[in-house]
Each structure stands twice: as C-alpha cells, then as structure tokens.
Amino acid sequence: MSLLHPNRPSTTQAPHLERLAPRAAIPGGSFEIFGSHLLSVTNDGPQITPQLPAAAFGDTTAYFDLVRPTRALVRVPEGAIASDLTLRANGALSNPLHANIGVPMADELHLVANPAIDADGNLFAMISGPRGERTPVSIVRIGRDLQARPFARDILNVTALAFGPDTYLYASSRAEGTVYRISPEGDHISTFAEGMGIATGIAFDRDGNLFVGDRSGTIFKVGPYGSHNPGEVFVFATLEPSVAAYHLAFRDDGRLLVTAPSTSSNQSIYAIAPNGDTSIFYQGLGRPQGLALDTDGNIYVAASLHGRRGIVRITPDGSNAELFIAGNDLVGLCFLDDGCAALATASTLYHLDLGITGRPLV
C-alpha cells in the first residue's frame, strides 16, 4: 500500500522472467522476454508513472527496444557473451534466464554467403570485395585455434565456397562467371568451369556433380572432377533472377534448395527435383540468403521472418518456420563438427554453441 495514497495498492514487484525467444542471438540481435511485472509503475502523487527496468547479460548492460508488463525486447550489446539475463526494477532483481549468445571468431572479412568447413574442422571464409575489385586475400582459413590465415589470393569477387568429394575447395567468382578449384593447402588454383554468367551459389550432389547458380536466372550442372566430363556445363533449371545471389543446398532426398533474394518481403525457398522440375518449398521470408540443413532435415536460412532478421528454422516438410537465432546483417551459416555453428554477417564470423549436428555437405 502507498503511504501517500493509502487506498492505492503498491505496484512494486520484482520482475519475473518466464522464457526467452529465440533460442540464441548475436550482438545486435534482440531477445524477446516473456514474463510478468517487466514494466513496473510507481505512485507519484496523482500519477502512476511507468519505470523502465535495467537489463544486463552477466555484467554487461543491455538496452530495450520495447518494454511492456508481460513482454519486452532486449538488444544484445557488443561484448556480451553467453550468460544470465536479469532485470532490475525499483531495487528488485528478477530471476535469471540463461541467454545463448554467439561470440566473434574472425572479423575484417567481406562475407556474401556461407562459410565452408573441411574434414579437419578448419573453417574457410571469403573476402569478396566490391564488384570488379581484387582484394589482397581472397579466402582465409580459420583453424581450431581460431587464428585466421590467408589461404588463397587472386580470385576476383569470391561469392560462394563449397568442398568437393575430392577434398578440394571450390570457389565461384561472380565477376568472371567462373568456378575455381583450390588444393587443400591453397598452393594451387585452377579454373574448373567458366562461362556461367554471374556465378554465385554452389553446391555438390551425392554423385559429385557441381551445381552453380547464375543469378540472372539459370542453375547450371557441372560434371565432376575425375569423370568423363569434368567441368562440362549443362543448363539444369531456370528461376526468377535475383538482385544479389543464389544460395544453394541439397536435401537428403536429392532436391536442391535455392534462395534468390530480391526486394520483396514475401520471398520463397525453391526446391528443384533431380529432373530439373521446380516448385516452391516455403514462402514468406524477407531477403533469404545462405542456408544449411541438420541431420534431421530441418532447414536453417539467413532471412527475415515477421519483420525480425536472423536465422530462420523451417521444418523438413516446410509446414512451419520460426526465428531460431536473432541477428541483424546475417548472410549465412555452416554447422561445425562439434554441435556448434559459424554464423556469417557481412564482416564478421560468430561462433555459437547450438548442440546441432549439421548434414554432411558431400
């Protein structure tokens, strides 16, 4: 009861946190908090004044995008790590909830698609550069010690990376319409296939065929290295053009999933059957980009869903989608060999423990 207004009950209660959504975030992304007494009020004369709580991830102060009594959006600040989130209001501290937060593992990159991982657990990422401009280093290798070292040079505008069944790294160049084949030590680079327009996303099927997305409307199929037709290019399917790049990933059933980001907020993931027939697998995303799958067949795609950006998880049958990781500027991801994931923004790779096993890519 208020001492100034004895007939008015006191509204000061400790905030109570029930759950957080989504499952994880990177700095710049926001967690949605569900609970009670998140927004307290004080009796100040005849007025009831809302009092914003203070939020912290561990010892790192955080700020709100929105606060209501039972729901709030709190933004993950730079420097935050996986820790307990608490709210404090009028001297009362909430119960803690663990917040899973990704931490930077490499920066000063120019990422336009998924990173790639080799059989030894090394991670590879591009420094793509502005169109038509070469960068001093084209691809970096990030070892288990999290040290980034130059891996390949002199590839113009690297746009996608994928490991082939021959253990070589393949890289597309959107400026040249070419896919390059790079030896495991990065000391030998050769042209594998060329003449593919604005070559962007790449992926291998189980037979070792390479699929390349020309963002102007064509998916090419390229004969595998070591076959009777290595590097030979065929038209596999056609799609609506993309303003940026195609991103490709294979399902266990042999269907090729493709995103083709544009300016629409209601975009699709396409599924292309082995015979080239194309259908819409899921619709309702904003600017979908890099995608990956887990061993259960769930699809993870860098996209916006209902106005929030991050990694969206879609069920294997395409019937349901949810924001799984919150983060602005995300362009792709890949699963590592220890249940963790590498998340790519335009300039930084983040490491995040998810406890998820990714689908083998070849």
Q: Whereabouts are the PLM-identified features?
A:
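Edge beta-strands of extracellular beta-sandwich domains
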Residues: 92-102
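A short loop-to-beta-strand structural motif that recurs across blades of beta-propeller domains
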Residues: 136-140, 177-181, 218-221, 268-270, ...
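Flexible, glycine-rich linker and terminal segments associated
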Residues: 322, 340, 346-362
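Immunoglobulin-like IPT/TIG beta-sandwich domains and homologous Ig-like subdomains
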Residues: 2-93
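Beta-rich, blade/repeat-based domains predominating
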Residues: 108-121, 126-131, 135-137, 154-168, ...
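Structural signature of WD-repeat beta-propellers
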Residues: 143, 173-174, 214-215, 273, ...
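Short loop/turn segments that connect beta-strands within beta-propeller blades
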Residues: 100, 142-147, 182-187, 222-228, ...
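A short beta-strand motif characteristic of beta-propeller blades
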Residues: 100-107, 146-152, 187-193, 231-239, ...
